[in-house]
UniProtKB/Swiss-Prot annotation:
GO biological process: leukocyte differentiation; mitochondrial cytochrome c oxidase assembly; multicellular organism growth; spleen development; thymus development
Cystine crosslinks: C30-C57, C41-C47
One Gene Ontology term, aspect cellular component: mitochondrion
Record function comment: Involved in an early step of the mitochondrial complex IV assembly process.
This protein's UniProt keywords: Disulfide bond, Phosphoprotein
Chain positions found as Phosphoserine: S37
Motif (Cx9C motif): 47-57
Family statement: Belongs to the PET191 family.
This protein's name: Cytochrome c oxidase assembly factor 5
Organism lineage: Eukaryota, Metazoa, Chordata, Craniata, Vertebrata
Residue ranges constituting the CHCH domain according to the UniProt record: 27-65
Coiled coil start-end: none
The species this protein was found in: Bos taurus
Gene name tied to this protein: COA5
Alphabetized InterPro entries for the sequence: Cyt_c_oxidase_assmbl_Pet191 (IPR018793)
Length: 74
């Protein structure tokens, strides 16, 4: 779920997806209850949809076709 804040400055490409991925990992049971690091929880498969969205956004920055279509993500 995207979280938009009007008073936040623009962070660059894929910043919204990156921020939401970080929040998802920090609020997951893996981090809160099991005490693991967000990196370990990401490798275990938590927040898969946001991880995939972040990957697609980063990949679209390298894709030559995206210059005309725009970046994927928000």
């Amino acid at each position: 779920m995207p979280r938009y804040y009007e008073d936040k400055p623009e962070g660059g490409a894929c910043a919204g997806v990156k921020e939401d991925l970080g929040l998802c990992l920090l609020q997951s049971d893996c981090v809160l209850k099991e005490g693991k690091s967000p990196r370990q929880c990401l490798k275990e498969g938590n927040c898969k949809a946001l991880k995939y969205s972040f990957f697609e956004c980063k990949r679209s920055m390298l894709d030559a076709r995206s210059r005309f279509r725009g970046r994927k993500g928000y």
